[in-house]
């Protein structure tokens, strides 16, 4: 009973015009992207979803990031509310580098020529590409052996959870 008094119950139907995909298309254009993506979700829609379902310190996962609206919405919401949410966005298509990550960069830095996105939202992000799969069974059988650097990166990350810097390999000893 006590939780009913402290929680907000959203409307069942969201009919705000700012939630239309047309708005998402206009936003992408203002960010400097021509028609590269059909029916992108608008920032306001994703921002509303994130605001209703997360709080300070939460991590938002979007496994099908598309044009990167989720990352953009989280950055905008963080700036507006002063709350620190993080996000992980995943995109497997070719436009991940040219659209998805570039949109997040522009949101962070701002777009000087845009009237709505001139101001930088701040924040940071890391962009990663998947490398070839390292399967332990194949390694144990001596098949498809990765290079020393690839294997060192895998072992180092598995052991520490940190990114591996190949420059730290001692060429003479092979030690990290």
Regions found by a protein language model. Name each.
Residues 104-176:
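SAM-dependent methyltransferase catalytic region
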Residues 3, 35, 89, 93-96, ...:
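Generic alpha-helical structural element
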Residues 23-28, 82-88, 126-134:
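Short acidic (Asp/Glu) and glycine-rich catalytic loops that position anionic groups and cofactors
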Residues 1-59, 86:
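Class I S-adenosyl-L-methionine
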Residues 5-6, 79-81, 119:
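A generic structural signal for short, solvent-exposed coil/turn residues
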Residues 18-19, 92, 132:
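Residues that form or immediately flank small-molecule/cofactor binding pockets and catalytic motifs
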Residues 43-115:
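Conserved S-adenosyl-L-methionine
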Residues 37-42, 96, 147, 151:
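Phosphate/oxyanion-binding active-site loops and adjacent basic polyanion-contact surfaces
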